């Protein structure tokens, strides 16, 4: 059995009120077009053809070499859009799935079931339908007394009886490929919209006594077509629920799943605990046994097993097992933390590698640095890595002790087991096993404070 797919992605999406093509609006981190294309892969199409139009280069860039593309210059209806794919698919034996690029909730399982139903029932066309509590705006499925599909009627063309029908057309179909393009040559624009309706091929097949079937979705949510921001928010809500439920089934605990945002490509191992208001985006992985507390935000990062991240932001970073971060820490892109590193409150790390069991507990900035293992970085330490034109590296050896409020002016190297005194400004190499003091000596003037205006003795 050879399958093909046509994805309709040419529309502008006027009701979105956006310069961005409709199918490129995102749901849970992926464009709607990407969601649809991932689901289409479930039927293993020999060839996928995407119909593009408005801002076609932007749309083409999303799928790149995963699909063939045809251009619809004028948007003259769904039938016209499918006609554009004729140059790619005409004359081929097999079954063709037609699906809109703005239906991000459709699942691969449903599309595979649709194809199987189509093949098993030897249909020339099979419509994916759903039962709607409020069918207004949808095309209605009209059946005869034997339950056979006889036509699909659009909302504007439906009579009073047809408008009461609850079974609706989702806009997804499977056709015998050859018969599809033969039938498209027979449709006209004689309807309320003045467009080529793809649905008109059903009547053509029926007139030729060819078999047309309908496969009813179990979950109405899958039928959602996104035409405005309200529907986009609905799709986001449904997708978020799906994602959190999937992770819960796989052994992840959510304390307040309604407040958590997890994008589609995030992976989470079992026995992770996620508190409320956590955001996980991009290609992030969370290792087993890790705890993410309230307010944590992680994007494109790998978090190892048994880590604890407390109300902190992590971007494009890698954390080994047993790392603790936060509260209120910020790990910026290019950060790597080895096993059991501790990054404490109000610590910022950027473009740095920090060795195992090193601790930076408070109020510290570490940028463009290579920090060894078992280093203690005192509160208020700053790596001065930028001179206004270039960035420079700081290297700190194993078991070094960086005193509180140290200012480390790069380029700089501090050797193993070296120590910098609290309050020092260090700008030269500190050898192994050395102590560096870079501050003025304390001068104490006894009794001098009595001469100052604020002293209590001055107010008498």
UniProtKB/Swiss-Prot annotation:
CDD domains: GT2_GlmU_N_bac (cd02540), LbH_GlmU_C (cd03353). It is an enzyme of class 2 (transferase). It catalyses: alpha-D-glucosamine 1-phosphate + acetyl-CoA = N-acetyl-alpha-D-glucosamine 1-phosphate + CoA + H(+); N-acetyl-alpha-D-glucosamine 1-phosphate + UTP + H(+) = UDP-N-acetyl-alpha-D-glucosamine + diphosphate. Mg(2+) binds at residues 102, 227. Its cofactor is Mg(2+). One of its GO terms (biological process) is regulation of cell shape. Pathway: Nucleotide-sugar biosynthesis; UDP-N-acetyl-alpha-D-glucosamine biosynthesis; N-acetyl-alpha-D-glucosamine 1-phosphate from alpha-D-glucosamine 6-phosphate (route II): step 2/2; Nucleotide-sugar biosynthesis; UDP-N-acetyl-alpha-D-glucosamine biosynthesis; UDP-N-acetyl-alpha-D-glucosamine from N-acetyl-alpha-D-glucosamine 1-phosphate: step 1/1; Bacterial outer membrane biogenesis; LPS lipid A biosynthesis. Residues 230-250 are annotated as: Linker. GO terms for cellular component: cytoplasm; membrane. Homotrimer. This is Bifunctional protein GlmU. It comes from Streptococcus pyogenes serotype M6 (strain ATCC BAA-946 / MGAS10394). The gene is glmU.
């Amino acid at each position: 059995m050879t399958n093909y797919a046509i994805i309709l992605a040419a529309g502008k999406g006027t009701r979105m009120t956006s310069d961005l093509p409709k199918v490129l609006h995102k749901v849970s981190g992926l464009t709607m077009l990407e969601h649809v294309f991932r689901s289409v892969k479930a039927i293993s199409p020999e060839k996928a053809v995407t119909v593009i139009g408005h801002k076609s280069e932007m749309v083409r860039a999303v799928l790149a070499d995963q699909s063939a593309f045809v251009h619809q210059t004028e948007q003259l209806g769904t039938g016209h859009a499918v006609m554009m794919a004729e140059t790619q698919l005409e004359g081929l034996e097999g079954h063709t799935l037609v699906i809109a690029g703005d239906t991000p909730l459709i699942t691969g399982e449903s599309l595979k079931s649709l194809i199987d139903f189509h093949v098993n029932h030897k249909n020339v066309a099979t419509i994916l339908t759903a039962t709607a509590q409020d069918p207004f705006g949808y095309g209605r499925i009209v059946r005869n007394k034997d339950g056979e599909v006889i036509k699909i009627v659009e909302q504007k063309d439906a009579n009073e009886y047809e408008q009461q029908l609850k079974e609706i057309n989702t806009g997804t179909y499977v056709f015998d490929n050859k018969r599809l393009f033969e039938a498209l040559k027979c449709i006209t624009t004689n309807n309320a919209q003045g467009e080529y309706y793809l649905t008109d091929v059903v009547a053509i097949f029926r007139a030729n006594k060819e078999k047309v079937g309908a496969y009813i979705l179990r979950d109405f949510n899958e039928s959602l077509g996104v035409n405005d921001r309200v529907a986009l928010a609905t799709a986001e809500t449904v997708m978020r629920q799906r994602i959190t439920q999937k992770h819960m089934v796989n052994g992840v605990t959510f304390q307040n799943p309604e407040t958590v945002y997890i994008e589609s490509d995030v992976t989470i191992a079992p026995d992770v605990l996620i508190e409320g208001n956590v955001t996980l985006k991009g290609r992030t992985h969370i290792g087993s046994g890790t705890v993410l507390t309230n307010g944590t935000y992680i994007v494109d990062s790998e978090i190892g097993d048994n880590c604890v991240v407390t109300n902190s932001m992590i971007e494009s970073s890698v954390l080994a097992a047993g790392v603790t971060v936060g509260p209120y820490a910020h790990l910026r892109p290019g950060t790597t933390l080895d096993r059991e590193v501790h990054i404490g409150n109000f610590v910022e790390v950027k473009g740095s590698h920090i060795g195992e069991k090193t601790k930076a507990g408070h109020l510290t900035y570490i940028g463009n640095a290579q920090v060894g293992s078992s280093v203690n970085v005192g509160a208020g330490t700053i790596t001065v890595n930028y001179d206004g034109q270039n960035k420079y590296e700081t290297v700190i050896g194993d078991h070094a002790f960086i005193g509180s409020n140290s200012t480390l002016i790069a380029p700089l190297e501090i050797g193993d087991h070296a120590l910098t005194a609290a309050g020092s400004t260090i700008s030269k190499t500190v050898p192994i096993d050395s102590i560096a003091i870079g501050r003025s000596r304390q001068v104490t003037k006894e009794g001098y404070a009595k001469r100052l205006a604020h002293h209590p003795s001055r107010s008498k």
